[in-house]
Design a protein with these regions (language model features):
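Conserved non-cysteine loop/helix-boundary elements of the Radical SAM core domain that shape
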Residues: 3-98, 104-123
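Terminal RNA-binding accessory module
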Residues: 114-211, 215
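Single conserved hydrophobic/aromatic residue that forms the stacking wall/gate
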Residues: 1-9, 212-224
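OB-fold and OB-like beta-barrel modules that bind single-stranded nucleic acids
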Residues: 28-30, 99, 155, 194-195
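Conserved beta-strand positions that form and line the central face of beta-propeller blades
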Residues: 39, 168, 222
């Protein structure tokens, strides 16, 4: 989805093509850095918030409810309270699944390090905390939006929760999902789960509907 893809039509054609791929995971990490155009200009970024929003809209148009994640820097030199609020409002409007938040760190030899208007660590911390709270809200809301959906889940490990054995994995959207341990599936298998509730914070669980891929041929023969 970079600028190299050219005009809107070509970007739309590209998104349509990846949406048709059966093995494509609908999880896209699109680094934003800031939702404020003034700050993006100071960062020498070659895109603006409207273009970024348009690309997010294309992904949602053709992939339904994909997981969109991003990176945001707070406290870049000369970032005013208004600039930060613009960035915050933009992040809120896109409604990312996850936002990785970084406080600007001055690095010797960079152009940004020589800029005036360096913010204090206390100012950066306040802005970071606000973004972190928004991120937590968005993550919970996205996970909740998946309740009732059928998720394809790769089982990654066996754990004990409240005295019971569970398999933990991630869906194609990278949502943490747990199912009770059973003999007909195991770690490294891919299953379909109907998400019904939260087992614990940020972990969905539900009914296993089918086995999509069994990792060991011998186990597959035994089950069949």
């Amino acid at each position: 989805l970079s600028r190299g893809l050219g005009d809107v039509y070509k970007r739309q054609e590209f998104v349509q093509s990846i949406a048709a791929l059966p093995k494509m995971c609908p999880h896209f990490h699109l680094s934003l850095q800031s939702g404020c155009d003034t700050t993006l200009e100071r960062m020498n970024r070659r895109y603006r918030s409207a273009e970024y929003a348009e690309k997010c809209g294309l992904l949602r148009k053709y992939l339904g409810n994909p997981a969109l994640t991003t990176d945001v820097i707070v406290g870049f030199p000369m970032e005013t309270e208004e600039d930060f609020q613009d960035s915050y409002d933009f992040v809120e409007s896109i409604h990312f699944y996850e936002t990785h938040i970084f406080k600007y760190s001055r690095r010797h030899g960079t152009k940004a390090a020589a800029m005036s208007g360096q913010l204090t660590e206390a100012q950066k911390a306040v802005r970071s905390d606000k973004m972190l709270a928004l991120n937590e809200q968005h993550a919970k809301e996205y996970e909740k939006s998946m309740l009732g959906s059928e998720l394809k889940v790769l089982l990654e490990e066996e754990v004990e929760i409240n005295g019971e054995q569970w398999y933990i994995g991630h869906s194609m959207e990278y949502i943490k999902t747990a199912v009770k341990k059973q003999d007909n599936y195991s770690v490294n298998d891919i299953i379909t789960v109907k998400a019904e509730e939260f087992l614990e914070e940020h972990t969905l669980t539900g009914e296993v509907l089918s086995l999509i891929h069994i990792s060991e041929p011998t186990r597959q023969e035994a089950i069949s």
